[in-house]
């Protein structure tokens, strides 16, 4: 007998739209082995759903790290197949997408569009024209403009989304990066009594003023009709497989736009991150950071030290989501400063080859080092980051216990943990992360 599984980090709101998008993931999650496979998946989806000319075609799960021989999806592939439809295929990291020409035009992206700090706009070789892939801060204005479903559609989607989680044994889900309009969707669902699993939301720091104009600090930390505002989310960097995570040393493969000596870039400056976290702490709220690279984790630690004024006695349960390329010395700091880690061992299966290419075998082998973290005394959890990876809690457990790649190769076997420890990461430890250890896990 096991308790209901607790999701330490995913994107619940994305489950609502899964049925409205084509699965463009590579095997074993989806059928798209190469750019042609992505196009076929989109065409089949458009045919089955009778999408008319001019209507948007959406896909999810595109993984450039799995495309053969560096043959990456670009706008030309999509333009040829969909000359009359805007098309957007979400990157597997959820930090960007590949758009065709009509979609680029729809969202105002052109040769005149400058790349913002912390953003990526891949350009067609020899030109300044966007070639399809838009990532990180450059993608945020596009994401904000995505079409919204009707109220009737939302009601059905909320039910189907919860069933994705419930079918995997999850009784507490996380909406781990919530825009205000998505929070309103969740709030309306809760008010209507449509939630049958618990959902914990972490609104983006960039929308904190708008959120706090609707809610008070007393609204955080408690469930109301199965919805809880857990705290605030601060995203410090991107994804390592997308080469947008922020490191102290360069990527072996350069940057996504061909940059040399590329270490990635932070989403915000250190000073901005410091001020953001202090605002969260001054409100008495929990913070979850998104940080993958070791330089991004350094920024989280510095912000925590600044915002806390060096007082680490308060029970804040600040959590660094992913913590994938954390260094041993940073784990020591986690313990000293009472920072939690939510790891992501499924990367040892899904993205190990990309990490070895990008970061080298030694660093890739210390990916999500749960055994070392637990031995040092770090309280840690383990997550899917759905829909980056499928909702499958037993796969989460398996990946932490075995650390085997898609190709059957061990990835840092010295960091394997026991089945019991792996279960704790999605039950009792996850309950602790949410301040719910007295009643869950």
Question: What positions do the PLM features span?
Answer:
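Short helix-capping segments at alpha-helix termini
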Residues: 191-196, 222, 307-314
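His/Asp/Glu-enriched, well-ordered alpha-helical/loop segment
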Residues: 156, 278-288, 295-318, 322-323, ...
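Acidic/histidine-enriched ion/cofactor-binding microenvironments in catalytic or ligand-binding pockets
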Residues: 221-228
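Divalent metal-binding segments
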Residues: 1-215, 230, 234-296, 316-317, ...
């Amino acid at each position: 007998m096991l308790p209901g599984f607790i999701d330490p980090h995913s994107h619940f709101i994305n489950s609502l739209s899964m049925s409205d998008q084509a699965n463009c993931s590579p095997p074993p999650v989806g059928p798209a082995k190469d750019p042609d496979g992505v196009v076929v998946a989109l065409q089949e989806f458009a045919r089955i759903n009778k999408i008319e000319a001019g209507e948007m075609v959406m896909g999810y799960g595109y993984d450039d790290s799995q495309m053969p021989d560096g043959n990456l999806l670009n706008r030309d592939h999509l333009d040829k197949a969909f000359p009359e439809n805007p098309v957007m295929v979400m990157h597997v990291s959820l930090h960007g997408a590949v758009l065709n020409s009509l979609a680029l035009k729809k969202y105002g992206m052109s040769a005149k569009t400058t790349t913002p700090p912390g953003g990526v706009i891949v350009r067609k070789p020899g030109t300044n024209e966007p070639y399809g892939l838009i990532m990180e801060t450059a993608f945020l204005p596009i994401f904000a403009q995505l079409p919204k479903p009707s109220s009737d559609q939302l009601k059905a989607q909320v039910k189907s989304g919860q069933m994705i989680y419930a079918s995997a044994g999850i009784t507490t889900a996380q909406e781990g990066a919530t825009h205000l309009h998505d929070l309103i969707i969740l709030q309306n669902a809760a008010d209507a009594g449509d939630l049958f699993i618990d959902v914990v939301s972490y609104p983006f720091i960039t929308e904190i003023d708008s959120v706090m104009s609707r809610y008070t600090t007393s609204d955080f930390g408690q469930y109301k009709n199965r919805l809880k505002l857990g705290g605030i989310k601060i995203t410090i960097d991107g994804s390592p497989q997308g080469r947008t995570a922020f490191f102290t040393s360069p990527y072996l493969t350069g940057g996504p736009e061909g940059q040399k000596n590329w270490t990635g870039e932070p989403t915000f400056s250190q000073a901005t991150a410091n001020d953001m976290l202090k605002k969260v702490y001054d409100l008495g709220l929990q913070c979850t950071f998104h940080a993958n690279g070791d330089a991004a984790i350094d920024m989280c630690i510095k912000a925590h030290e600044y915002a806390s004024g060096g007082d680490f006695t308060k029970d804040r349960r600040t959590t660094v989501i992913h913590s994938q390329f954390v260094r041993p010395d940073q784990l020591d700091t986690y313990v000293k400063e009472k920072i939690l880690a939510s790891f992501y061992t499924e990367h040892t299966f899904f993205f190990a080859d990309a990490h070895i290419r990008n970061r080298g075998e030694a660093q890739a082998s210390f990916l999500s080092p749960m055994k070392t973290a637990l031995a040092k005394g770090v309280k840690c959890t383990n997550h899917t980051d759905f829909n980056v990876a499928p909702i499958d809690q037993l796969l989460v457990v398996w990946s932490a216990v075995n650390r085997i790649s898609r190709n059957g190769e061990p990835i840092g076997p010295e960091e394997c943990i026991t089945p019991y420890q792996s279960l704790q990461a999605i039950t009792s430890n996850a309950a602790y992360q949410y301040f719910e250890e007295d009643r869950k896990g």
